[in-house]
Amino acid sequence: MIRSPKFTSSLMAAVLAVCGVAASTSAIANEAVTVQLKWVPQAQFAGYYMAAAKGFYKDAGLDVTIKPGGPDIAPTQVLAGKQADIEVDWMPSAMASREAGVPLVNVAQVFDKSGLMLTCKKKSGVSSPKDFKGKTLGVWYGGNEYPFLNWMNKLGLKTDSDIKVLKQGFNVDPLLQDQAACISTMIYNEYWQVIDAGVKEKDLVTFFYEKEGVSTLEDGLYVLEPNLKDAAFVARMGKFLKATLKGWDAAVKDPEGAAKAVVAADTSGSSSLKVQKRQMENVAKLISNAGTKKIGYLEPAAFDRTIKVLLTGGSDPVIKKDPGKAAYTHAVWEAAQK
């Protein structure tokens, strides 16, 4: 059957219109990014939630999925399994994973100070690190144990004989119930759980890894090294980082707003504004570059210090070889400055 020219033109116009709409939609479609957090929703990750809540990701043309972590989630495994584009991790566990064969590369360092500490009851008889010998010390595992193990090696304490290591759950019960002389805490979280449980600050002794000279870099952003060969990936991560750092600046300036963003994102309903605001106020102390152009920039000297700590762990160091400059890049951070 022969179609009339008019019908053919109309049909062609319709087809072109549909194609045009499809092309236009494709052109403006947001780029997808999935970030895997190290732990459950809390102010430790307020910058990501703030960036989402304030529309910074959307404004950057991104569709960002924020995956919470948890006790049964290993962020590096999620990243290696290609279920995320980028992850939040501590440098000790990231470098240990890299040495074990997962090619992690640091692309940004949000926290430039450590919030990790051991919190002890004075009545346990601990007043200095010299008193650790013979005591039970609570330690988080799942990658969080590396700074502790390095510290004990530096003190010359064997973890299988000189002290008793309690594999600590993610609560403060061992200290409250006197099952351990000291437990692992973060200045922005578990330490305050101890206080909220009724223990007075004057009855506690705290040892900050930062002050003990054994601190390592904590919350940073990591990707898989092969992906960095893709210019489009680097550009996409640059957009993500720029929006994320904007979210962190906003969170530091507005702890209450950050707390609201975190609570809104916590589907478990366990978060409270009071607790998350306090946590954000303490997290802010770990981001000394907030509000400056240096936020998120990994200082090579800080990287070198962390690697030195990880290598000088006595007979059982966290890593056995210096990963070198290949373990970090400023390419994504530089892309975020555009």
What kind of feature is each model-predicted range?
Residues 230-313:
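Secondary-structure end/capping motifs
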Residues 2-14:
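Bacterial N-terminal signal peptides that target proteins for export
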Residues 30-177, 181-188, 209, 215:
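Short, glycine-/small- and polar/acidic-enriched structural segments
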Residues 56-59, 155-159, 197-200, 268-270, ...:
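Short helix-capping segments at alpha-helix termini
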Residues 303-338:
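Conserved C-terminal helix/tail region of periplasmic/extracytoplasmic solute-binding proteins
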Residues 22-25:
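N-terminal signal peptide c-region/cleavage motif recognized by signal peptidases
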Residues 92-93, 170-174, 178-268:
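Pocket-lining segment of extracytoplasmic ligand-binding domains
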